[in-house]
Amino acid sequence: NTRHICNILPETAYADSLLVVEVLTPNGNWSSYPPHKHDSDNLPEESSLEETYYHRVNPPQGFAFQRVYTDDGSLDETMAVQDHDVVMVPRGYHPVGAPHGYDLYYLNVMAGPKRIWKFHNDPQHEWMVKQ
């Protein structure tokens, strides 16, 4: 699994509440994977941040997939995202997949009550990190 990250406005930079990250996911790979969330104010384990994804797909006629879901299933949406689409992530896990043949770029903007990015992996998929 491959992705390239550029922290534009990390926690260490001066700002009031925003965190900004660019991510390039080459075709055939996943990002925000294993699925993670940051919707609970439970520091130091997890911070509460809403997030937006602004997607760019190359070539532009392509698509990618994004799923946003919660542990209790109250939110479970899987979207085919296209070039210039925006996805709002108010809560929950939010993995992104770039299918073969289509590179994916996205701009993440996150904000919350505390400007700290601590995420929690989905326990069902945590085994991937431990391999």
Where are these regions (language model features)?
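Conserved metal-binding segment of the jelly-roll/cupin
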Residues: 80-101
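Short, glycine-/Ser/Thr-/acidic-enriched flexible segments
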Residues: 60, 93-94, 111-114
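Double-stranded beta-helix
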Residues: 1-14, 107-131
